[in-house]
Amino acid sequence: MQWLAIGLGAAFGACLRGWLARFNPLHHWIPLGTLGANVLGGLLIGLALVWFERMGSGLSPNIRLFVITGFLGGLTTFSTFSAEVFTFIHHGRLLAALGLVGLHVGMTLLATALGFYCFKLVL
């Protein structure tokens, strides 16, 4: 049952990631789909951390596997992000690479904190 929860979650997350990838060509140095997937993943993991903390042991472990390992694992794009940064470096665009790293890390951390604290206020 655990593998099914992870697999189904990953399928949904990957589908959303694929849809978001359509936005990558809209800007010449910021792959917006990748950034959107990572920022959304950061926001959702913040929400999930609070939700799972509040639900405690009354929640099936398979739900956590579905959401965090599956869905968010399928949605977020660290390997794609790494490839995009490397491509900038490889083409001599070091400032663009550094800017992209700062943008992804900074916005994802902010989104995680936003999701965490906003959801904590609601619950």
UniProtKB/Swiss-Prot annotation:
The chain crosses the membrane at residues 1-21, 32-52, 66-86, 94-114. It catalyses: fluoride(in) = fluoride(out). InterPro entries: FluC. GO terms for cellular component: plasma membrane. One of its GO terms (biological process) is cellular detoxification of fluoride. It is a multi-pass membrane protein. It is found in: Cell inner membrane. Na(+) binds at G73, T76. GO terms for molecular function: fluoride channel activity; metal ion binding. Keywords: Cell inner membrane, Cell membrane, Ion channel, Ion transport, Membrane, Metal-binding, Sodium, Transmembrane, Transmembrane helix, Transport. Na(+) is not transported, but it plays an essential structural role and its presence is essential for fluoride channel function. Belongs to the fluoride channel Fluc/FEX (TC 1.A.43) family. Fluoride-specific ion channel. Important for reducing fluoride concentration in the cell, thus reducing its toxicity. This is Fluoride-specific ion channel FluC. It comes from Psychrobacter arcticus (strain DSM 17307 / VKM B-2377 / 273-4). The lineage of its organism: Bacteria, Pseudomonadati, Pseudomonadota, Gammaproteobacteria, Moraxellales.
